[in-house]
From Swiss-Prot:
Belongs to the nepovirus satellite RNA 48 kDa protein family. This is Satellite RNA 48 kDa protein. Residues 31-42, 62-73 have a biased composition (Polar residues). It comes from Beet ringspot virus. Residues 15-78 are annotated as: Disordered.
Length: 424
């Protein structure tokens, strides 16, 4: 019992003792009835349950205003700090037609014996006196950075300088980019929130009719896709970095800018070719087994290209659903398993890793070596026989074979491979 003084208007001090409020749940207290508004404070100490619509909260004549509103785990009275006597398994609250308040047991605080050293773990003093070991998460950028710092890994042509004007420029539009807005070209720029280079990743293009032909349009940005839904893509590789320019943009590329077609076809925007092109988001589906987790991870790229465990190449159409061998159909005719989203994400991550690495490497190696590495990477992914979305296959083909490429994408609901036509 807590006793406290209160000064009454007459000035004399009176010691009051507040009775402890313990909800008594007895059989007498049925949860359904409501008393008349006058007798809210229950003289017998029985719990009074008011219906929710009973107009306002019950106020005690006592000093205690009831427990603070939402404290279900450890309900305590507001000023007396006394924990409500609740049984071990919980209790029915007095408010809101008596919902069940579960009781969470409190953990005892047992202080650990400080000087004792369990399992030769370091003490604070050891940690503070020993030098720090810095651990870096092996993202491709951090690996490259570490290797660049160690200066042992890359055979760079001459000296690696970070100054922007001594960079060997490969793409003829990087010069424009450097002179107009000085972007740091050497490091691979991380993707921003609404990055244009990533449009093809986060924007699912939707077929819209413009005039009499159907075009795929990104509903976010309103950009038309370069694919015609019927004909497929046609693209050409334009420089030693295997930059891809789609054929209808080629005259614009020759003039030194790229035309972005808008849905209204009124505005023409002139921009230099971005370092990463945008590719189709329609998946070019190759048969997909569950080997995706064996793909090159960031830690093993680009230093060592491990061959796959199975050394022999697996023909895609070795057997049909019945399990008997099929030799008659052309090999792109195989029925296609579509990848799950997780597999797709894995492949996409590997691809982006490889792409960033190649972009960072391009200043340290010659174009020949660069292309060989690129092809090695892709051969490794090919060996795993995974599903390639179009935006991945386009740079692969255009980067490997330096000539015009045609990709025919399967129409909706059609399981068909893709054909590569190369005029050498």
């Amino acid at each position: 019992m807590k006793s406290y003084f209160c000064v009454t208007p007459s000035g004399w001090q009176e010691t009051q003792t507040r009775p402890r409020i313990v909800p008594k749940h007895s059989e007498k207290c049925s949860r359904t009835y409501s008393r008349p508004r006058s007798s809210l404070s229950d003289s017998e100490g029985r719990c009074v349950v008011l219906p929710r619509d009973g107009g306002g909260r019950k106020r005690k004549s006592n000093g205690s205003q009831g427990r603070c509103s939402n404290n279900p785990g450890r309900p305590s009275r507001k000023w007396t700090e006394k924990t409500i006597a609740a049984s071990r398994q919980g209790f029915f609250s007095k408010r809101d037609n008596g919902y069940w308040v579960p009781k969470s047991p409190e953990k005892k605080y047992v202080p650990k014996v400080f000087p004792r050293n369990m399992d030769n773990k370091k003490s604070f003093k050891d940690v503070l006196t020993s030098p720090a070991k810095i651990q870096i998460k092996p993202t491709p950028e951090s690996i490259l950075l570490a290797q660049k710092i160690q200066n042992s890994t890359f055979k760079s042509r001459g000296k690696v300088t970070l100054s922007q004007f001594s960079l060997p420029l490969i793409n003829r539009f990087q010069e424009i980019q450097l002179t107009t807005h000085l972007e740091p070209v050497e490091e691979s720029t991380p993707f921003g929130v609404n990055d244009q280079r990533a449009q093809h990743l986060f924007c699912k293009k939707v077929p819209r009719k413009i005039g009499r032909n159907t075009v795929l349009v990104c509903p976010i940005t309103g950009t038309e896709s370069h694919i015609d839904a019927k004909r497929g893509i046609s693209a050409r590789i334009v420089d030693s970095m295997a930059s891809v320019v789609h054929t209808e943009n080629l005259p614009a590329y020759e003039r030194g800018h790229v035309v972005t077609k808008n849905v209204s076809r009124t505005k023409r925007v002139c921009t230099p070719v971005p370092i990463i092109g945008t590719f189709s988001d329609r998946a070019i589906r190759v048969e997909c087994d569950d080997h995706t987790d064996e793909l090159a991870s960031a830690s093993s790229v680009p230093s060592i290209w491990k061959p796959s465990k199975k050394q022999h190449a697996v023909p895609i159409s070795s057997s049909n659903e019945m399990g008997s061998a099929v030799g008659t159909k052309p090999d792109w005719y195989t029925p296609v398993k579509t990848c799950t989203h997780r597999q797709y994400q894995k492949v996409q991550r590997v691809f982006l890793d490889a792409m960033n690495i190649m972009r960072t490497l391009r200043f340290h190696t010659g174009p020949q070596e660069l292309r060989e590495t690129w092809v090695k990477c892709w051969l490794q992914v090919h060996k795993k026989n995974v599903a390639f979305p179009g935006w991945m296959i386009t740079p692969l083909l255009s980067g490997t074979v330096p000539c015009e490429q045609e990709f025919f994408l399967p129409k909706a609901g059609e399981t068909r491979g893709f054909a590569t036509v190369c005029y050498a």
